[in-house]
Design a protein with these regions (language model features):
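Mixed-charge, Lys/Arg-rich low-complexity intrinsically disordered regions
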Residues: 2-25
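Secondary-structure boundary elements
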Residues: 1-4, 59-61
Length: 160
């Protein structure tokens, strides 16, 4: 049989590719993508977007969006104290992508990316790591116990 040179990606429709990619995204997966105001990320120095690491917390009940928290190198000193307290340190000794420095998950700022947008930004090199189930439980706890959390949003993504 002659090989046509087509890949699975060539054969699948855009909708099918989106479904395959989105269904492969799991709680605890870490990605690095160029995010913008659509995901609640503000650019720096005149840029409209920023490359950010983030950890997936879940899919919404309709399968249309992914919930996530941003992972930062430091806690923004301009945040209110209540939000600073909801940053969970993740240890570089557990995760190679941190390159020897502990980073922080901002559990006070639950963000959403549409499935369509995620697929649009996705490539296999964007996947960086998997956060341990112990750390995911800590992240969820911090998010749930944040007094200003959007309860409706947390419920939509299965945290409540």
């Amino acid at each position: 049989m002659k090989h046509s040179g087509n890949t699975i990606g060539d054969i699948l429709s855009e909708k099918m590719k989106a479904e395959v990619i989105a269904s492969a995204v799991n709680e605890g997966d870490v990605y690095r993508m160029c995010l913008d105001e659509r995901e609640g990320i503000i650019g720096k120095n005149g840029a409209e977007s920023r490359n950010k690491y983030f950890v997936i917390i879940g899919h919404d009940s309709d399968g249309n969006a992914l919930g996530f928290f941003v992972i930062d190198t430091e806690i923004n000193r301009n945040l209110p104290e209540i939000r600073k307290q909801k940053h969970l340190r993740i240890e570089s000794s557990k995760y190679d992508f941190l390159n020897g420095t502990d980073w922080y998950v901002d559990c006070s700022d639950f963000k959403i990316i549409s499935k369509h947008r995620f697929v649009e930004l996705f490539s296999s090199d964007k996947a960086k790591a998997k956060i341990s189930s112990d750390d995911i439980e800590k992240i969820k706890h911090e998010a749930i116990t944040y007094r200003n959390a959007n309860r409706k949003m947390l419920k939509r993504f299965g945290l409540l």
